[in-house]
């Protein structure tokens, strides 16, 4: 491939590790300036997961030991501080020291680990733990986040109680439902479990019927 892309990725990794990683408490700061000054030391799971995604894909492409080390540290930080052992799932936001700031549960912290890195790491490493974690998260999604019409909803309390008055739940996010349909079919391809295929195709059919404009070829953003 074009080595300039690898060099840019390496420069980004250098910056992330030098300025973005919290050496005292672990985890990635939400935001730093271009010069590396921390401007938001909280640890939103959205940020943690996509930092981890970058490390995972860089590791797959380069087998870089430093990236692999920070990938392990990132995943360990999230598992130790953000995973809810009682109810399952990741909480939304941590304080700098890893204590829970917001224990609500949103779509992205649950599903982004699958679409971001777990379903790429498993084919690359064949580590069954990655596939088992992906299946566990998908099972939680289907159990707690899918309504009786088959749609995936957005925000929940710590114990997975649906929050009907939350602004994120005022509509259905079409893109997120498309993501789940793809993830279900990807899990079927990796596991051979026909239940994933059945559920993925059912959600796909529902999306095509209610959210796709055949005349324009475009998807609605929400329902």
Where are these regions (language model features)?
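Glycan-recognition and catalytic cores of secretory/periplasmic carbohydrate-active enzymes
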Residues: 1-223
